[in-house]
């Protein structure tokens, strides 16, 4: 007789990947548990996507009202404590909905930090539990760069940066990636003087150059943010009145004094839970898996940000669902990431779907592109938008393979553009599809039409 396990599946981590896997596997009526050391929902619900969306919504609304010449009332003020309270209420609602879905599916919640004892056993809050199979969905955490002084000078993280209860005069954001740009947007909308530093030559270096240029122009010309590319922070110091940030630009060291420092220096996979005890191979960049998410231990799988590489909520949820479906059906369908969207919640928002132009240049792949600037459509005049564009990319036969949008509410176009790219829609088919003339999505139609002339 084989070994009897406490569960058929234990899933470590309740973020989008772990939750998707758990809810899909629950259809099998097997004994399933999910381990979470914090609130259910992972960083998506509790510290990243939802709290950021709630906070940025408020800050954009405040900035729109206070900066518009139409609204005459100058007595409007922003309450940081009330904003944090709103954010926490929003998170609680989402977390409770996640918890309710897992409970209704009969999934057991194990509260605590998991650590492997052996290949089939973990310890959770002093209890030992066994499973026939494991799914690792432990996500990622803040990566602290090699900056002298982080052990003695206080700083904010992406999690705490949007929970401040009073306004600093000057804030420095270290890191010009998506998270750093969203924090810069949040602060500047509320009247905080912001400096943002990026080691690369432009903001958002993993997007096409037009994206970084558009967001930089919005930051500097509309929000008054000081953008400092090609800068590396080397040390933090504290004096009686302020924090001192020592940074290097080319070969010159300079100092800037600020009230608040936010480290938005990227993330790294969470790997410190006894993977060696289970015989799981991993690197500093993430857990090693095959094309079906199987680790070196054949009964243990991994999905989501703990794999390293490109990450997003949509990608993690897709991986969790695909893995669980394969396990239920004893199939080996491999992931198809064609046309996956990623978004950045600045204003204008950034949406990228499928290939970027940089991706194709690196692959030495031939393509056609068309760009429509936001000023070319009526919506820009109606909604007073100055910076943005749509770029569509097709292969030689005019099938869409990539799209980049910088515009207010760009994320609303994710479904349309993802559908087009995943299902091989041509530029002609998209150009022939009616779009609302006075809305931002009209740029998509115009860009598709322009592709036909290439």
Which residues make up each language-model segment?
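Glycine-rich flavin
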Residues: 2-7, 23-30, 35-167, 200-204, ...
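Beta1/beta-strand and adjacent pyrophosphate-binding region of the FAD-binding site
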Residues: 3-15, 167-177
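Short glycine/serine/threonine-rich phosphate/pyrophosphate-binding segments
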Residues: 17-24, 44, 155, 180-183, ...
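Glycine-rich dinucleotide-binding loop and its adjacent helix/turn
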Residues: 49, 138-193, 197, 226-227, ...
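FAD-site-proximal beta/loop scaffold in flavoenzymes
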Residues: 152-167, 255-329
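A conserved FAD-binding loop/helix module that cradles the flavin
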Residues: 214, 303-359, 437-454
């Amino acid at each position: 007789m084989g070994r009897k396990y406490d569960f058929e599946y234990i899933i470590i981590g309740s973020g989008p990947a772990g939750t998707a896997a758990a809810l899909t596997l629950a259809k099998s009526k097997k004994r399933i548990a999910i381990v979470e050391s914090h609130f259910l929902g992972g960083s998506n619900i509790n510290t990243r996507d939802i709290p950021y969306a709630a906070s940025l919504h408020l800050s954009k609304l405040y900035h729109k009202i206070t900066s518009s010449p139409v609204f005459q009332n100058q007595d409007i003020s922003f309450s940081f404590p009330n904003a944090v309270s709103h954010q926490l209420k929003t998170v609680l609602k989402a977390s409770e909905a996640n918890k309710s879905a897992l409970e209704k599916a009969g999934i057991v919640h194990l509260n605590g930090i998991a650590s492997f004892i052996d290949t089939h056993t973990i310890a959770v809050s002093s209890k030992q539990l066994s499973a026939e199979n494991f799914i690792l969905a432990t996500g990622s955490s803040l990566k602290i760069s090699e900056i002298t002084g982080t052990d003695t000078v206080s700083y904010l993280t992406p999690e705490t940066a949007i929970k401040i209860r009073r306004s600093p005069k000057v804030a420095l954001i270290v890191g010009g990636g998506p998270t750093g740009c969203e924090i810069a947007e949040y602060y500047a909308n509320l009247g905080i003087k912001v400096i943002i530093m990026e080691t690369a030559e432009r903001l958002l270096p993993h997007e096409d150059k037009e994206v970084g240029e558009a967001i930089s122009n919005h930051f500097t010309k509309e929000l008054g943010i000081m953008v400092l590319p090609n800068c590396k922070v080397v040390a933090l110091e504290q004096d009686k009145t302020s924090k001192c940030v020592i940074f290097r630009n080319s070969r010159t060291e300079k100092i800037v004094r600020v009230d608040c420092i936010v480290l938005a220096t990227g993330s790294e996979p969470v790997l410190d839970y006894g993977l060696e005890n289970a015989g799981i191979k991993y690197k500093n960049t993430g857990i090693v898996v095959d094309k079906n998410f199987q680790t070196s231990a054949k009964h243990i799988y991994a999905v989501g940000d703990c794999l390293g590489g490109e990450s997003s909520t949509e990608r993690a949820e897709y991986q969790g669902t695909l893995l669980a479906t394969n396990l239920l059906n004893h199939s080996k369908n491999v992931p198809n990431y064609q046309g996956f969207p990623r978004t950045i919640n600045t204003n204008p928002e950034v949406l990228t779907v499928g290939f970027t132009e940089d991706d194709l240049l690196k692959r030495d792949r031939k393509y056609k592109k068309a760009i429509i600037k936001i000023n070319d459509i009526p919506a820009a005049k109606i909604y007073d938008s100055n910076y943005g564009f749509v770029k569509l990319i097709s292969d030689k036969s005019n099938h869409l393979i990539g799209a980049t949008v910088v515009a207010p509410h760009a994320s609303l176009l994710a479904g349309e553009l993802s559908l087009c790219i995943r299902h091989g829609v041509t530029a002609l088919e998209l150009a022939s599809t009616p779009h609302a003339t006075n809305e931002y999505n009209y740029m998509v139609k115009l860009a598709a039409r322009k592709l036909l002339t290439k």
